[in-house]
């Protein structure tokens, strides 16, 4: 990405292209993400009583006498990428989907039951909030990747073969670090049913209770899922793309080739990192439940301990819960995202050739 090249792409143009890709991808893929997390949030048996908050996906709680002693439930009510939590006192707030609880036997069954009991709009619930988070995060991530890859190759710090893997891992780690506090704060806001205007107060309360490090409590499992995913994805994407391109130059990559390469790479990376996705869902669930019950947060279990616990309780299948919807989502979402991004870059490339940068 040479800024002196009239046909080059500026970082701002990269951000616009990736932001547009995030919007298109979210519109198409949010329903599959809803189903994926709903399946992951199920346990073999439903816990009816609260014991250790970090052990359950679905937690019962009872309000104190000062709050009318109304029993309720803290459920992971997924709304796409953000996977928020909702509090359900007496089932009144959660309406139909809480009063008529269902268990899903598979991906298709989940789609049918969600639409039947909660309505079609539920598959896209929370999309605006999803876009608020994903658009800037994706813009930062993809722009950082391209800039880092160009730097690594330009400075000969690593071979062209492994530059995408290193750049992808570094870009994702930086993005996760920036976004992780925002995701945790959003979970607290959802659990407490307060408005976004009270965001500052929510942050202050979290910092006062657990220090600044508390804002990154979900960083570990998120990084363990997203950083390897990113490294594997970009390595395979560039490799598959070069194979499909053949002797042609990289700049001549078509949208179709980007779509196929992105889909294959996303499917491989999603399969290998699925156990960490399950852990991330469970940890987010437990953190939200603790916040909802206004109790002192327990000691946070390590990612590896959670992996062993899930395997002990649910077997190896538990580590790959939501496999089908994650794969079904990962392949097309990665394909749509990267092809839209490449199309956007091609558009700006042609635009810059016709009207050189700086004029």
From Swiss-Prot:
Keyword set, alphabetical order: 2Fe-2S, Heme biosynthesis, Iron, Iron-sulfur, Membrane, Metal-binding, Mitochondrion, Mitochondrion inner membrane, Repeat, Transmembrane, Transmembrane helix, Transport
Signal peptide: none
Reaction(s) catalysed (UniProt annotation): glutathione(in) = glutathione(out)
Control of this protein's activity: The activity of SLC25A39 is regulated by levels of mitochondrial glutathione via its ability to bind [2Fe-2S] iron-sulfur cluster. Upon physiological levels of mitochondrial glutathione, glutathione prevents iron-sulfur-binding to SLC25A39 promoting cleavage and degradation by AFG3L2. Upon depletion of mitochondrial glutathione, SLC25A39 binds iron-sulfur, preventing cleavage and degradation by AFG3L2.
Family to which the UniProt record says this protein belongs: Belongs to the mitochondrial carrier (TC 2.A.29) family.
UniProt-annotated location(s): Mitochondrion inner membrane
Organism: Rattus norvegicus (Rat)
Main location: mitochondrion
TM region(s), chain numbering: 15-35, 122-142, 165-185, 215-235, 256-276, 318-338
Solcar repeat start-end pairs: 9-151, 159-243, 253-347
InterPro entries recorded: Mitochondrial_sb/sol_carrier, Mt_carrier_dom_sf, Mtm1-like
An MF annotation (GO) of this entry: glutathione transmembrane transporter activity
Residue ranges, Mitochondrial matrix side: 36-121, 186-214, 277-317
Topology of the protein relative to the lipid bilayer: Multi-pass membrane protein
SUPFAM superfamilies linked: Mitochondrial carrier (SSF103506)
PTM summary: Cleaved and degraded by AFG3L2; degradation by AFG3L2 is regulated by the ability of SLC25A39 to bind iron-sulfur. In absence of mitochondrial glutathione, SLC25A39 binds iron-sulfur, preventing cleavage and degradation by AFG3L2. The presence of mitochondrial glutathione prevents iron-sulfur-binding to SLC25A39, promoting cleavage and degradation by AFG3L2.
The keyword Transmembrane helix appears for this protein: yes
Domain of life: Eukaryota
Stretches assigned to the Mitochondrial intermembrane side: 1-14, 143-164, 236-255, 339-359
GO cellular component, one term: mitochondrion
Function: Mitochondrial transporter required for glutathione import into mitochondria. Glutathione, which plays key roles in oxidative metabolism, is produced exclusively in the cytosol and is imported in many organelles. Mitochondrial glutathione is required for the activity and stability of proteins containing iron-sulfur clusters, as well as erythropoiesis.
Binding site for [2Fe-2S] cluster: 74, 78, 88, 94
Protein name (database record): Mitochondrial glutathione transporter SLC25A39
GO biological process: cellular response to iron ion; glutathione import into mitochondrion; heme biosynthetic process; import into the mitochondrion
């Amino acid at each position: 990405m040479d800024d002196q090249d009239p046909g080059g792409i500026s970082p701002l143009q990269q951000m616009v292209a990736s932001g547009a890709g995030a919007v298109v991808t979210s519109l198409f893929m949010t329903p599959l993400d809803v189903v994926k997390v709903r399946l992951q949030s199920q346990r073999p048996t439903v816990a009816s009583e609260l014991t250790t908050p970090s052990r359950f996906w679905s937690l019962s709680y009872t309000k104190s006498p000062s709050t009318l002693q109304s029993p309720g439930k803290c459920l992971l009510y997924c709304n796409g990428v953000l996977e928020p939590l909702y509090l359900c006192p007496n089932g009144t707030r959660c309406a139909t989907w809480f009063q008529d609880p269902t268990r899903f036997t598979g991906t298709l069954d989940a789609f049918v039951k969600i639409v039947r009991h909660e309505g079609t709009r539920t598959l896209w619930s929370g999309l605006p909030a999803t876009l608020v988070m994903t658009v800037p995060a994706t813009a930062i991530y993809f722009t950082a990747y391209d800039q880092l890859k160009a730097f690594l190759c330009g400075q000969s710090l690593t071979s062209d073969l492994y530059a995408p893997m290193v750049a992808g891992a570094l870009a994702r780690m930086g993005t996760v670090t920036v976004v992780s506090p925002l995701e945790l704060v959003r979970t607290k806001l959802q659990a407490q049913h307060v408005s976004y205007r009270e965001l500052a107060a929510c942050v202050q309360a979290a910092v006062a209770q657990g220090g600044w490090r508390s804002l990154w409590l979900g960083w570990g499992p998120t990084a363990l899922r997203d950083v390897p995913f990113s490294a594997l994805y970009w390595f395979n994407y560039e490799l598959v793309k070069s194979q499909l391109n053949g002797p042609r130059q990289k700049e001549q990559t078509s949208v179709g080739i980007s779509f196929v390469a992105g889909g294959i790479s996303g499917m491989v990376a999603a399969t290998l990192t699925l156990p960490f996705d399950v852990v991330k869902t469970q940890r987010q669930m437990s953190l939200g439940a603790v916040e909802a019950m206004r109790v002192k947060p327990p000691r946070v279990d390590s990612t590896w301990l959670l992996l062993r616990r899930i395997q002990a309780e649910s077997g190896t299948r538990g580590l790959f819960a939501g496999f089908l919807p994650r794969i079904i989502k990962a392949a097309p979402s990665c394909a749509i995202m990267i092809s839209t991004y490449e199309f956007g870059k091609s558009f700006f490339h042609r635009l810059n050739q016709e009207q050189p940068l700086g004029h």
